[in-house]
């Protein structure tokens, strides 16, 4: 997977490649789809959500420019797969999931795999997690109609937010960097994610 799906498509951060290469993706998937664990595609999990394709997890993780010392906020825990990757790359991770069943399952799995630096919380991810802000990096694993000010406001100086922005089935992956209070926006690649539901996202699934 690392050589043919990630490195061959331009992922060059060795720490990101190592993190994905060591992580058993099948453990984050339903039993009936584990045979597809190393296919480079998103796959359904519970609650109408998906586990992101390995390439997209790698691309988003690389875009965060993590060195190992950062405090990271993830919006949309899902299966916990991306949170585990981030746990290998950063000092600490808070991951927010709006579906209690998914949050509880992911938290238990992450604990069983030894990710003591990853904490899963239940809540509206579009609000961020202000009590632990600011964050060096924030990543959103669902598509937003616009960049929530509630999230950019929780970035530390120099902090990066990586988020898909756009309408259903037509989004642009963006990186927003807090440069001393000024927000620098960069386009990374077109993408398609499930909708980001919440007070500062979509109100209902598209």
Describe these PLM feature segments:
Residues 1-77, 81-84, 89, 102-119, ...:
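Class I SAM-dependent transferase core
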Residues 65-184:
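Conserved nucleotide-cofactor-binding alpha/beta core module
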